[in-house]
A protein has these predicted regions:
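Catalytic core of DAGKc-family lipid kinases
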Residues: 1-102
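Residue-level signal for tight coil/turn positions that link beta-strands
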Residues: 38-39, 125, 195
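Glycine-rich phosphate/pyrophosphate-binding beta-alpha loops
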Residues: 47, 51, 104-119, 183
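Gly/Ser/Thr-rich active-site loops/lids in small-molecule metabolic enzymes
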Residues: 60-70, 113, 119-140
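A short catalytic or substrate-binding loop motif that flags glycine-/basic-rich loops and adjacent residues
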Residues: 79-81, 124, 161
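Exposed beta-strand and adjacent loop surfaces of beta-rich binding modules
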Residues: 84-86, 127, 174-176
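ATP/nucleoside-binding phosphotransfer catalytic cores, i.e., glycine-rich phosphate-binding loops
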Residues: 91-93, 97, 122, 132-208
């Protein structure tokens, strides 16, 4: 389920192949949401900014040679090129302007090798979770890394968070969008959630 198995992690499917096969045998069906950006579906996260540079740095050779460690290597490359950009985010009838290094819109809970979108994020809650990284230096991001692993990054004043069923994002110039590791769209963009759109075999939530 991708280089870092983030969808499997969100669904509580074990990394061990035998245990994963047991999930299929158990046959528990679960309906999950699907996100979309300009009509392109995604399960985990669609984002603008840092993660696009990361996706470009994380080429096939890096994935094959280093696996999950390749994310850390690609992240270091992306951080050296990080620049802020201006964006306008609309949710319902509210629009706000931001100067940011990354905007991420999550449908699932995990992405990027175990980073948490938001502490309360779930793939079957009928909502999208957005965050915008509005810090001024990459060193501030380095200090926040532990918070991203736990989903508590929203407590930092440099992180703007929002929750909704749809977002529209415009930027001062067209920017690529990374959706589940693939560059599938560009701004301006509309992000939507499609509740219960897919049925999967997965452990029951209380069994995870």
């Amino acid at each position: 389920m991708g280089t870092a198995n983030d969808l499997a992690r969100t669904l509580g499917i074990p990394d061990d192949l035998g245990q994963a096969a047991d999930v299929i045998v158990a046959g528990h069906r679960r309906r999950i949401d699907v996100g979309s950006v300009n009509g392109h579906p995604f399960f985990n996260v669609a984002s603008i900014g840092l993660s696009v540079d990361l996706a470009r740095s994380l080429d096939g050779g890096l994935k094959r040679r280093w696996g999950r460690l390749g994310y850390a290597i690609a992240a270091m490359r992306a951080l050296t090129r990080a620049r802020r950009f201006s964006a306008w985010i609309t949710e319902a009838d509210q629009t706000w302007r931001t100067s940011t290094m990354q905007i991420a819109v999550g449908n699932g809970r995990f992405y990027g090798g175990g980073t948490v979108v938001a502490a309360h994020a779930a793939i079957d809650d009928g909502h999208l979770d957005l965050y915008s990284l509005e810090f001024h230096t990459v060193w501030q991001l380095a200090m926040m890394l532990r918070s991203f692993r736990s989903g508590e990054h929203g407590a930092w004043s440099e992180v703007h968070t929002a929750r909704g069923t749809a977002f529209e994002i415009r930027t001062s110039r067209p920017m690529k969008i990374n959706a589940d590791g693939e560059l599938l769209a560009e701004t301006p963009a509309v992000f939507e959630v499609h509740p219960g759109a897919v049925t999967v075999l997965a452990p029951l939530p209380q069994d995870q």
